[in-house]
C-alpha cells in the first residue's frame, strides 16, 4: 500500500492539480456511460472520484466491479469541478479526483442497511451490526465529540492541580443502592468481587492519603432497570478535593463545564450558574432537575381555594395537601377536552387522582370547575393568566402534586414550542434533604449516598430527628437532566457511624460493610468533597441526541444485552465448576432482592 496523502474528507481546493493517494470505503457508485463516479468515504467525509478511459482504461474496469462498502485505495489528480457540478453542501464539493490507479483492499457483502444518516432501521439491527452503524457520519461525529470532551476535561483538570488516579475495577460489594455486578473468585470459592458502582469510597480514601485533588474518567457498573439515559456500564467524570467548601467545588466545576462548552461547542456560558434550593425547585418546577430554558412556574393556590365549594380542592388542603397550578399560554384554543383528559390518565402514574382545568376567556373563565369560582378573577390573578390561556390544577400530597405538574410543565413546554432547543441552561440544585422516603420499599434512604455530610447546624439531628436534616450536597442540572451530583463528605468517624445508624445499620453490620472506611477515618481525614458528572449524558446533550446509546461506541440494548456479541450468554460447565458455581433455573431475581437497602446517590 502507498502512503495516504490526506483524508478523503479533507481534499479541498488547496490540492487542485496535485497527485493524491486516498483510502476509504465506497459510499456509492454511479455509472454514466463512459464515466464512473464513486463517492469515497472516510472518517472526515466524502470526496467524489471520477474514472474514465481518458485517465486509465484498467482503473475504469476495476471501478466498474466495486460495490458499496468495498475498501479501496486510489491515486489520482485533484481537479476543480465544473461550476454546474459544484456541491455546496459538501466540504469537498468544489473538487473531484480524476483517478488513474485503483486497488481493491477488501470486498464487502451487501450491508443489512444503507450506511447513511436517516435510514429507517430497527435499534436491534443497528446494535447487531454496530461496526456498520458506527460508519455513519452522525455516529462518527458523536464519538469524536465524546473524545473532544474527554480531552478538554483532562486538560482543564491537569492544569488545575488534579491528579489522574485509577481505582480498582474488582472490589468489594457494598450496599450502595443498585444491584452489583458480581465476579466470582476462583481462588476463593464462594466469594465474589463486585464491579464498582462508583469510585466513591476509594476517592475518599485518596483524600485521606493526602493527594488533595483527584480525578478519573471512571467506568461504573449498576445492575438496574434501563431507560434512554441509562446503561448498565457507564462513564463518569469523577472529582474529589480536600479542604474546599461546597462553593469552591462548584466554582471549579463551573470552570470545567465552561471550558468544555467553549472547546467543543464554541459557546461561552454565563458564569456563575444559577443556584436554586431543592425545595424551590420542587415548588416552582415540580422537579429536582428543573429545565430553566422556559418559565411556566408552578403556582400555589392552596390558600385561595381551601374554603371553596369545590370539595376536591378544599379536601386536599384540609388533609394536609396542596393545590397547585400551571398556566399554558394560548392553550385555551389549542387543547380540547379530549386532549386534556389524555394527560389526566397519564399523570395517574404519579399517584394523582385527576386533573382539573379552566380556560380563561375575555368574559371570565370556563370549564368543568368554573361554576365553583364565580368569575374566577382572584384565581386568574393569582396564577398570572390572561385571556386565551389554559390553567391546569392538581390537588394532592406535595410530592404527587410536584411530580404530576413537573411532568405536565415539561410536556406542554415542548408541545407549545416554549423551549429553545439550541439553548444550554445550567443550574445548581442545593440544600437537599439528607434523607428521602422511598414509597416502593417503605423506608427512609439517603437522598444521595450515606457518606454525605449534613449541614453543620443539622449534625445534632442525627441523634434526634435525622429525617429533618439537610445535606451539604449539590446537583448540577442541564436542560432538565441531572448532569452530575456531589457533596461534602463525612470525614469524622462518629458522624459516619450515626449516619449509618439512622439508616438502620447495627454497629456490627456497619463494620462488616464499611469497616475499612470507618477504620480509615480514625487516622486524620481532611474535610473533603467532590462531584461526579455523567459523561455519557453530557455527550448526549451536547450532540442533541435523546438516547445515550448513540454516544457510546458499543452500548447495551434496553434489556442490558449486546446483540453483536450475544452477551450475556451461558458459559461452559467446566468454567462454572472451576468457580464452584451451580446455575439454578428456579430463581426469581426480583424476589431474591426484596428488602435490599437503597443507598443510591
Curated annotation (Swiss-Prot):
Binding-site residues for ATP, renumbered to this chain: 222-224, 231, 482, 534-537
Keywords, in A-Z order: Aminoacyl-tRNA synthetase, ATP-binding, Cytoplasm, Ligase, Nucleotide-binding, Protein biosynthesis
GO biological process annotation, one example: aspartyl-tRNA aminoacylation
Known catalytic reactions: tRNA(Asp) + L-aspartate + ATP = L-aspartyl-tRNA(Asp) + AMP + diphosphate
Subcellular localization, as worded in the UniProt entry: Cytoplasm
Principal place of residence: cytoplasm
Residues in coiled coil: none
Gene Ontology cellular component list: cytoplasm
One term of GO molecular function: nucleic acid binding
Protein origin, superkingdom: Bacteria
PROSITE patterns (UniProt xref): AA_TRNA_LIGASE_II (PS50862)
The keyword Aminoacyl-tRNA synthetase appears for this protein: yes
Keyword Metal-binding applies: no
Region of interest (Aspartate), residue spans: 200-203
Residues engaged in binding L-aspartate: 176, 222, 448, 489
HAMAP family named in the record: Asp_tRNA_synth_type1
Function: Catalyzes the attachment of L-aspartate to tRNA(Asp) in a two-step reaction: L-aspartate is first activated by ATP to form Asp-AMP and then transferred to the acceptor end of tRNA(Asp).
Family per similarity comment: Belongs to the class-II aminoacyl-tRNA synthetase family. Type 1 subfamily.
Name of the protein in its database record: Aspartate--tRNA ligase
Taxonomic source organism: Lacticaseibacillus paracasei (strain ATCC 334 / BCRC 17002 / CCUG 31169 / CIP 107868 / KCTC 3260 / NRRL B-441) (Lactobacillus paracasei)
Amino acid at each position: 500500500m502507498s502512503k495516504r496523502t490526506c483524508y478523503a474528507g479533507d481534499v479541498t481546493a488547496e490540492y487542485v492539480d496535485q497527485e493524491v493517494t486516498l483510502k476509504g470505503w465506497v459510499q456509492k457508485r454511479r455509472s454514466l456511460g463512459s464515466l464512473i463516479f464513486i463517492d469515497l468515504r472516510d472518517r472526515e467525509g466524502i470526496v467524489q472520484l471520477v474514472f474514465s478511459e481518458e485517465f486509465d482504461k484498467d482503473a475504469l474496469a476495476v471501478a466498474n466491479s466495486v460495490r458499496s462498502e468495498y475498501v479501496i485505495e486510489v491515486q489520482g489528480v485533484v481537479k476543480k469541478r465544473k461550476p454546474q457540478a459544484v456541491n455546496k453542501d459538501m466540504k469537498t464539493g468544489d473538487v473531484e479526483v480524476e483517478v488513474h490507479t485503483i486497488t481493491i483492499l477488501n470486498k464487502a457483502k451487501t450491508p443489512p442497511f444503507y450506511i447513511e444518516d436517516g435510514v429507517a432501521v430497527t435499534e436491534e439491527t443497528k446494535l447487531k451490526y454496530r461496526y456498520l452503524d458506527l460508519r455513519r457520519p452522525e455516529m462518527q461525529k458523536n464519538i469524536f465529540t465524546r473524545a473532544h470532551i474527554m480531552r478538554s476535561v483532562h486538560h482543564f483538570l491537569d492544569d488545575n492541580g488534579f491528579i489522574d488516579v485509577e481505582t480498582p475495577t474488582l472490589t468489594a460489594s457494598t450496599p450502595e443502592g443498585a444491584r452489583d455486578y458480581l465476579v466470582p473468585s476462583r481462588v476463593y470459592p464462594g466469594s465474589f468481587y463486585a464491579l464498582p458502582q462508583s469510585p466513591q469510597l476509594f476517592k475518599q480514601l485518596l483524600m485521606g492519603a493526602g493527594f488533595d485533588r483527584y480525578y478519573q474518567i471512571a467506568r461504573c457498573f449498576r445492575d438496574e432497570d434501563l431507560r434512554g439515559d441509562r446503561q448498565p456500564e457507564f462513564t463518569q467524570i469523577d472529582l474529589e478535593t480536600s479542604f474546599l467548601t461546597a462553593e469552591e467545588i462548584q466554582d471549579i466545576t463551573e470552570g470545567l463545564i465552561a471550558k468544555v462548552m467553549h472547546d467543543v461547542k464554541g459557546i461561552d456560558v454565563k458564569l456563575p450558574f444559577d443556584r436554586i434550593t431543592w425545595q424551590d425547585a420542587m415548588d416552582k418546577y415540580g422537579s429536582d432537575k428543573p429545565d430553566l430554558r422556559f418559565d411556566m412556574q408552578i403556582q400555589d393556590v392552596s390558600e385561595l381555594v381551601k374554603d371553596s365549594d369545590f370539595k376536591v380542592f378544599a379536601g386536599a388542603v384540609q388533609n394536609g395537601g396542596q393545590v397547585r397550578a400551571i398556566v399554558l399560554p394560548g392553550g385555551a384554543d389549542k387543547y380540547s377536552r379530549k386532549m386534556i383528559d389524555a394527560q389526566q390518565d397519564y399523570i395517574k402514574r404519579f399517584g394523582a387522582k385527576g386533573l382539573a382545568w379552566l380556560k380563561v376567556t375575555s368574559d371570565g373563565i370556563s370549564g368543568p370547575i368554573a361554576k365553583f369560582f364565580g368569575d374566577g378573577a382572584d384565581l386568574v390573578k393569582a396564577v398570572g393568566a390572561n385571556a386565551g390561556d389554559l390553567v391546569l390544577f392538581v390537588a394532592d400530597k406535595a410530592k404527587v402534586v410536584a411530580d404530576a405538574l413537573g411532568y405536565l410543565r415539561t410536556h406542554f413546554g415542548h408541545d407549545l414550542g416554549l423551549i429553545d432547543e439550541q439553548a444550554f441552561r445550567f443550574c445548581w440544585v442545593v440544600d437537599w434533604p439528607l434523607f428521602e422516603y422511598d414509597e416502593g420499599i417503605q423506608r427512609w434512604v439517603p437522598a444521595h449516598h450515606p457518606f454525605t455530610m449534613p449541614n453543620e447546624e443539622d449534625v445534632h439531628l442525627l441523634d434526634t430527628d435525622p429525617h429533618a436534616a439537610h445535606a451539604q450536597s449539590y446537583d448540577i442540572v442541564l436542560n432538565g437532566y441531572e448532569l452530575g451530583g456531589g457533596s461534602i463528605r463525612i470525614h469524622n468517624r462518629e458522624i459516619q457511624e450515626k449516619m449509618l445508624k439512622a439508616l438502620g445499620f447495627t454497629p456490627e453490620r456497619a463494620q462488616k460493610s464499611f469497616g475499612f472506611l470507618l477504620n480509615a477515618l480514625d487516622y486524620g481525614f481532611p474535610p473533603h468533597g467532590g462531584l461526579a458528572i455523567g459523561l455519557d449524558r453530557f455527550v448526549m446533550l451536547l450532540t442533541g441526541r435523546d438516547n445515550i446509546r448513540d454516544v457510546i461506541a458499543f452500548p447495551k440494548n434496553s434489556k442490558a444485552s449486546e446483540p453483536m456479541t450475544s452477551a450475556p450468554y451461558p458459559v461452559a460447565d467446566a468454567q462454572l465448576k472451576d468457580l464452584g458455581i451451580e446455575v439454578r433455573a428456579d430463581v426469581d431475581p426480583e424476589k431474591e432482592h426484596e428488602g435490599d437497602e437503597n443507598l443510591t446517590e
